[in-house]
From Swiss-Prot:
Subcellular location: Virion
Keyword terms, alphabetized: Viral envelope protein, Viral matrix protein, Virion
Function summary: The M protein has a crucial role in virus assembly and interacts with the RNP complex as well as with the viral membrane.
GO-annotated biological processes: virion assembly
Classification via Pfam families: Matrix_Paramyxo_C, Matrix_Paramyxo_N
Keyword Cytoplasm in annotation: no
Similarity remark: Belongs to the morbillivirus/respirovirus/rubulavirus M protein family.
Highest taxon of source: Viruses
Species the sequence originates in: Human parainfluenza 2 virus (strain Toshiba)
Protein name: Matrix protein
GO CC, any one term: viral envelope
GO MF: structural constituent of virion
Amino acid sequence: MPIISLPADPTSPSQSLTPFPIQLDTKDGKAGKLLKQIRIRYLNEPNSRHTPITFINTYGFVYARDTSGGIHSEISSDLAAGSITACMMKLGPGPNIQNANLVLRSLNEFYVKVKKTSSQREEAVFELVNIPTLLREHALCKRKMLVCSAEKFLKNPSKLQAGFEYVYIPTFVSITYSPRNLNYQVARPILKFRSRFVYSIHLELILRLLCKSDSPLMKSYNADRTGRGCLASVWIHVCNILKNKSIKQQGRESYFIAKCMSMQLQVSIADLWGPTIIIKSLGHIPKTALPFFSKDGIACHPLQDVSPNLAKSLWSVGCEIESAKLILQESDLNELMGHQDLITDKIAIRSGQRTFERSKFSPFKKYASIPNLEAIN
């Protein structure tokens, strides 16, 4: 089974995201207070004349709130001691922000209420009651409300109970400067489409989670024999290709490899809508596969939509793309089980964008409180 395996280069700025180190405020002599921090990454070309857009994600904690009312902040007495659970809230794409440090400062103005509800499954509702002026043009801030799967954005949604009011307090913010053409996600109906007239091409990534040997994640994923964390497999639906006469002439395997080589696919990872896999085609895209890519040959796949548990693991640890493979399968489920998968390594791991740097923020730990941003100054 062909596998691409690349060595890590943590010294290269383009191959990592700066981690969120645990920094404690010790001015009052108390331990366990986290300072707010920012992580910045640039995906746009350094000398590009085009103005980039910014993707902003926040990571923090949900707290229970005293229902007696009143204005609160992260140091307010109406918040119950200790967080309920960790949380991620994506603000999505927005305009260029010239001074990224202003984003960190603006977190003090955030007031986000959290509520749990249910339809077909449990859902989390985030209401942005107070939005910093700097961030009002970002996607979520325009809508002022996010209704999403509770499993995707709350570390442990089962801890939220009826009869309580909850607020979300962001602690860490990730801002990614990127070209405008990265603002593209494949529509769900296209990803779910199956037919006996097409083959499905899938991408399997083996991600190395850079956790310690005593991490709880070691029980959830395969241990790496080299001792560098653990390994996780994640599959992504890349595209469909039409079954035609060329298959009979070339053979199924030769046809598959030829299509993969002609597309010249590259894969990378970045913090866009949370941890996101980016697939880019540098070559010819077959007509049947065109709906899976933007006009620039790009497709972004947020990991929380593909594998929520794996995405939440990356809130606290980094990862490396250890290997990448393309798999050809029958699209129709009735034919899928009766045919063997074809596997090839005709996909490149994009140089400089194969590592998702670990964060020292850990959703497995509780912290007493979070200091006001003024403590940073």
